[in-house]
Amino acid sequence: MYNCPNCAGNLVFDIESQKLKCEYCSTLLDPYEYQKSQDAEESDMFGVTVYTCPQCGGEIMTTNVTAAGFCTYCGASTILDSRMRDEKRPAHIIPFTRTKEDCRKSYSSLVRRALFAPREFRDPEFLDRFRGIYIPYWVYNYDFSGDLHLKGSKTYRRGDYKITDHYSLSGEVDARYHGLTYDASSSFDDTVAAAIAPFEAAKMQPFTPSILCGFYADAPDVGNEVYREPVLNSISQDSIERLSGVPEYRSSGADMPSADEFKNQLRGSSMNLSSEEPVCAYLPVWFLTYRKDDRVAYAVMNGSTGKITADLPVDKKKYILGSILLAVPIFAVLAFLITMTGQMVLTASSVLALVSLVIYGLELSAISDKDSHADDKGFAAAGRSAGSSGSPDAGDKKAEKGVFAAIRNYGKYALLFLVVLLVFPRLGLDYLTGSGNLTGFKIYGAVSVILLFGALVFIWALADSETAKKNMVLQIAGSVIAVGASAAILVWNPVSDLWFYGGSILAAAGVCLSFLGIISKYNILATRPLPTFYDRKGGNDRAK
């Protein structure tokens, strides 16, 4: 507890004044001078209260704040368990300079542009749940100098010949990259950290625990070796971009070499590359959590620069209403400008259904990557698990899945063979008899079946997580029926247009059903699985 020396009231760090402020008598104190008066001796540890969520295991630390009744990471409304602990003192800290009111304004502006965002995202009570957390980051400093030798090239045409000129780009370089930051917490997704980067290294100050007053902090559990390669990649990319602006290089017109080639130069004998041992720093982040069922959405703002990112799912009711309001004028305009036959309408519906299947498949791939934390090095390095089964019969279920997967794969090819036997003989008969009924619409109808098969194989190949597979068959059924029915009618080519218009209505209904499935999958993609921190390892042992 940090108490006011005048009235013994609770002290908090005031963002506007950048000083400690008493909540009762409004006394302002310099955080460094106050800390000196409190510390009997310098120590590389400082005492904190650790609050743990009983549902997900997430931890946040504080020096003097009673935890609110909800978890920052999983959004659960619960009483957090607490205990005292000594934490390793970081080297630096950037105090908050953006207030909670700044968060509300920035987030409200972001949500205002998201027309289909859930109504709760505009609720003032919800916006008041922004929580200030200091996230641990590793700070990297690199210096390099020496002779630079790179290869460039310029390709152009002269008549029928394609000519490539090769250039040797040489020079001397002397550069320093200081204050490069990467998060040291496995609970803070690397993609989110990248979205709010960079922090202003010039604002870093020596750490003192009193600056944490009124805020929370996360514990480091990712070692500094994890991001050494990404740091060099970042330095190489920035260096190449800067070199491309040098007049001597730019005047040649040559294409600059890749960042990988520059990185190889950094590690070569002609370059003196040096780095300091990375140090830990606490950097300010505003955090807002929205939870629905078994998914969470985060809004995160850089507490120093104000840069914000947010997960924004879609409200299905708003989406349906907006789609109807948009579709009516579009349909009216098209009806006046374009005369479409029944075959054209049916073909267009079929194409739209195929496109929806491709979009659906791409979403499945993105969901699998996101839920497995494929782009989060810190998550993997901390020994975290994206999800596992602890049941004793998990191995048997896996083997059972393998058997059914094999049957399903062979079944696809059998189905394709059956379709070829049924559809293409009809087209061949039209061609051999010269009946004149072999039209482009008929050919498309047959080809669309092959495309449908390819789309289904594409979808099944990308659905490699349970979240992605959930309700998948139902969600794609509409488009599958749309393509199948359209193909059958186009190949049959009945005399009456009623078949084409009836098929178009059926196909349109199927596409609408599938688009609802796409929105459902988008909402999964726009949110995150509930975190589990019970397998979280580390603390000061890993983050050393």
In which residue ranges do the predicted regions lie?
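Canonical alpha-helical transmembrane segments of integral membrane proteins
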Residues: 323-338, 412-427, 449-455, 477-488, ...
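Short cysteine-rich clusters marking metal-coordination/redox-active sites
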Residues: 4-7, 22-25, 53-56, 71-74
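Charged, low-complexity helical/coil segments in non-catalytic cytosolic or luminal regions
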Residues: 88-291, 317, 329, 338-414, ...
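Residues immediately within or flanking Cys/His clusters that coordinate Zn2+
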Residues: 1, 17-19, 46-50, 68
